[in-house]
Amino acid sequence: MTTTWKEEIEGEMEFYGESLSDIISSTMSEDQMNIEFNNSMNAVLEGIPFTIWTESRVYFPVTYDTGEWCGSVSRNPDGKPTAHIGGG
């Protein structure tokens, strides 16, 4: 399946009540966010690495069996454990 980091990031942000307008800092340019890549399992890793910060979360790429998507954690200590990222 073809996607962009913008689509993947927006989906993760929406889950936490955020949007792209909440970004404080990003290691990716807007052009890089819009590059299409194949995020299917057993495909070649194609998405570029990134880190994005908002007031409340930090967003980053996650991979499992070469499937790629966006994950995030709280920017500040919240007492909630982080589940294993990238696998079942």
What is the predicted role of each segment?
Residues 1-88:
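Acidic interaction surfaces
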